[in-house]
Amino acid sequence: VEAGEPADSRLMQHLLSDVMGDGGQWTMAMNVYKKYGAVPKDLFPETESSKNTGEMNVQLRRLLHTAVAHMYADPASIESVIAEATAAGHRILTIHLGEPPKSFDWEWTDKDGEFHRDGEITPVEFWQKYVGSADLESYVCLVDDPRQEHAKGKKIGIEHLGNVAGGDPTEYLNVPNQFMKDCVRQILEEQGIPVWFGADCHPMMDRENGAWATDLFEYGKVYGVDFDLNKEDRVRFADSAMNHAMAFVGVDVAEDGTTTRRWRVENSWGDKIADKGYFTMSDDWFTEYVYEVAVPKALLPAEYQAALDEPATMLPAWDPMGALAD
């Protein structure tokens, strides 16, 4: 944000209203992993605040709002305010989550019962050695932005949407929804690994039984209202935006071997609902409410790979294509 940006401008009010989101984009996760690494969960277990982040986030947002107010009150003190707020943020996170280990002794037993020992290792070394082979950092994010002014096969990005200074920007390749489906199905069938995605999880959802389908409820008949917005209009008029990230873990194909019937989804809402936390999504619901998937770059045809080297069309911070980070 440029110095002198009015506190009541649309940009500042948007950033302040979402000063610290609890979600995020694939690129954001990769930025964190590349800078800080990862540790096995057994060595840095869950806390009450990691399982329920609400109160912790309230305090972090309050800290950031206070810091911004102090910057506006005394512009000459911006650097010192940033330093103090950064230290305070680290302190709050440590109180709620604990201090991540700077190094650890890595020992494990594999699926065949064989014991292994790798000695002392840092989180960054662990990420590079044991996760780097999956090449997750080379994945690209595909989106289905249905608005006609945003051409398919072109890159788009969101201004001010980032989480690590100097990290990779959050950018997407805009593609047809069917191409996203084809990529997801190919990964599930050929590699058998989960596929990260972002969707508008609220419409036509049976949370208790774990189902998404476009014809799940007949609200129009109940209320006598024709809810006739298509996907483009829902995005344009703020009726829909991606708001939750999950993972595709399975696909159900019809007997013809071609038609996709439904998708199996691993959610993060606990195992007391749905099928022990797993949901079923109809293929038509994917069409209407799935907006983003992360896939290996190698799956893209030559013209799409070439498009990744072109500059992105930047959209404003409040654009719905940036909503998943809320």
Enumerate the language-model features and the residues they cover.
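Solvent-exposed loop/turn segments at secondary-structure junctions
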Residues: 40, 201-204, 254, 271
